[in-house]
Amino acid sequence: MSSEKQPFYEENGRMYHAYRKGVYMLPCDEQEQDRLDIFHKLFTVARVSDGLMYAPHPRNGRFLDLGCGTGIWAIDVANKYPDAFVVGVDLAPIQPSNHPKNCEFYAPFDFESPWAMGEDSWDLIHLQMMFGNGQTGQRLPAMASPPHDSYYSQSLASSRSRNNSDAMDIYAITDRDPPAREPSGYSQWYRNGSPSVNSIHSKSSEKQPFYEENGRMYHAYRKGVYMLPCDEQEQDRLDIFHKLFTVARVSDGLMYAPHPRNGRFLDLGCGTGIWAIDVANKYPDAFVVGVDLAPIQPSNHPKNCEFYAPFDFESPWAMGEDSWDLIHLQMGCGSVMGWPNLYRRIFAHLRPGAWFEQVEIDFEPRCDDRPLEGLAIRQWYQYLKQATQDAMRPINHNSRDTIRDLQEAGFTDIDHQMVGLPLNPWHQDEHERKVARWYNLAVSESIESLSMAPFSRIFNWDLDRIRRISSEVKSEAFNKEIHAYNILHIYQARKPAN
């Protein structure tokens, strides 16, 4: 993800990045990139043992590289740990495009601006050569200056500790338990997918599971990963969308993908659990599991249905590879950082020949009989798109990218359906009008929920401004003279039988 504007400019014969011009005082041309890679090589040689990091870390963990430069450290870590997920961020978009599949880069990204990357969610955060480039000492108090006076008089082990190197590995910026001590009730799964006796229960956070922000309740597990609330108002909104999807589908309202009636179904980001409960009621011989970051699922669910929360499906799973007959994901855009990595994980957990189904809404407003430029609904979507991109969990949806990522993950027989979602019942067709009535209700309940955290956290908007644009969007959504619509995308993809 790079800047849409010209990303570089020339000064004194050298090239500098143009994003937040002047923040970083070093160039970013090819000569500078060579210099950064030379320093990376120096650090790997200067370290006594592991040339990449000293801090304890899991081999399948989540690694974040701040100010990644050319991305060389992130790429080396991704190649060393193929089961890990590595993200590099930088002001300048100078990272290669041919990086490992378990590695992602986001630029331009200013890590001295507010983040929305998920608190309590990273196993290791790495920062290298940042002194002199902003107020990182104030932002990251773990960055202590090395004791220069007695450097060579110390023992070798001490002089090479991570506290005495500018190549810093920040293991725990936030107050979090080491990975081995995190909630483990949902990770007690055998490889064949059969849950252990101790894991058959709904798992919730041992810490306070929710916190309040701008008058709405959000889940506290890995705070900030998911930018939508989880209070009763939000739960009603999710259930309305579930109803909308069942109405918008032509035939089976729950899923299109082939599936056995007595199969094993996994619902990722299950929300209130309504889809999982409906499937469990429809197929009493099936076994249905729903996982979510927020423990908001009901306790009175069917006996053949289980919920596990908090559960971050972008972190490593232990739920039985090759064991699920269908994996379902609904409205994941805006909450996922690395789609290719997630698709590979889904692929690994499906039985050979089993199916994955994904349902997404493309919120970009469309209209066939008039331009929407200048309308609040168009401006709102552009703001939402930018805010979620800055948070590295974009809400905008691209079907070509989705199909490509599914193919690269190994899926075959990919089917893609598109359904129009009118914002109000302006259409003459009765089925379209029924869909529109449900979608109008869903949108009216969604504008403020979708806007609150992205606009306040990323743009620092106050509540009055957020509510004002939300009200304008709702007014246009109710206006039958504006024939706007969104697109519902439904994908089915099969894991090959062989």
UniProtKB/Swiss-Prot annotation:
Induction: Expression is negatively regulated by hstD. It is an enzyme of class 2 (transferase). GO terms for molecular function: methyltransferase activity. Its EC number is 2.1.1.-. Its main location: nucleus. It catalyses: L-methionyl-[protein] + S-adenosyl-L-methionine = S-methyl-L-methionyl-[protein] + S-adenosyl-L-homocysteine. Component of the heterotrimeric velvet complex composed of laeA, veA and velB; VeA acting as a bridging protein between laeA and velB. Belongs to the methyltransferase superfamily. LaeA methyltransferase family. This is Secondary metabolism regulator laeA. The gene is laeA.
